[in-house]
Amino acid sequence: MLRLGAWLGFGHYALGFHATGTLGVVGAAAAYAYLLRLPVAQWRTALSIAASSACGLRANFGTDTKPLHVGFAASAAIRAVGLARAGATASDDALAGFAQAFAGGARLDPPRWDALTPWAVLAPGFEVKRYPSCYLTHRMIAGIQRLRERHPPQAGDAPVAIDLLLPHGSVAPLKYPQPRTGLQAKFSATYCAAAAWVDGHVGLASFSDAAANRGALLPQMRQVRVAERPGPHEPLETAPVRVTITGPGWSDAILVDWAPGSLQDPVTDEDLLAKWADCAANGQVAAPAAIATGWLAAGMDRPMGSLLHSLRGAILARSGNAGG
């Protein structure tokens, strides 16, 4: 999935697709085929069938359907592998058509993969989402939190003016300036910015329906102004975000080049533990700190091949004639 994403680029997202759904089905089919040790011919067929099941629209951001893209992709991947094992046929060059369809007609050279190519999960690696909101909000949240550390708000302070200058093409996905639900708030620049300033923390609790409808947050939301840089389309994953905050007698600005959790600004163990604790509290998991500490101790330096070997054994033990 990482290789496909790098191949298609962010233009795929700009066209209105959600890569979790469109690329996830192919990536999940490849992973499942690998775990089951499918013959090469069946593996190729499974990927081709999966490519015909690819779907996921950005238009559904802020609704229950957006997270369902993950399940749809996994379900379609399992079905694709099962059909391939059962003898279904598919084109040998489906990925070429896949690229033509999902890259908006852009001419793409075929990806070059061979046995010597490092796994993308290792090189260049993958990013960890730091906040449970749209990725396009992450740099603005980080910038606001850093400015908040410089200028800590006091109880009773008036709302500050927050000006956000985003990369060209960033505003369209953030389509809810006045969110009415927690899901909509995840895709609201005004809400995420106001919550980052007022609360000082953006976590799962920030995106409950009750939190999204807090009347006390409205005065600050009204002071958030969002603009895009003019000009040609920018790579949304690398283009910086400028945050300017103006309060009584002061004004400060910061340029955030990389999202927290990116390869250039990686999460720390403390960040991962905090994220796990937030998720565990939301899911009412007992003893979250002990579980997470154990995971980090067991897996930090474990070779990827060893992890996949263990996973394959667990899959085969549970599924028996999986996918048949």
Model-derived features with residue positions:
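Glycine-rich, mobile lid/loop segments that gate access to catalytic sites or pores
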Residues: M1-R79, D93-A99
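Terminal-appendage/accessory-domain detector
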Residues: T65-S75, G82, A86-G324
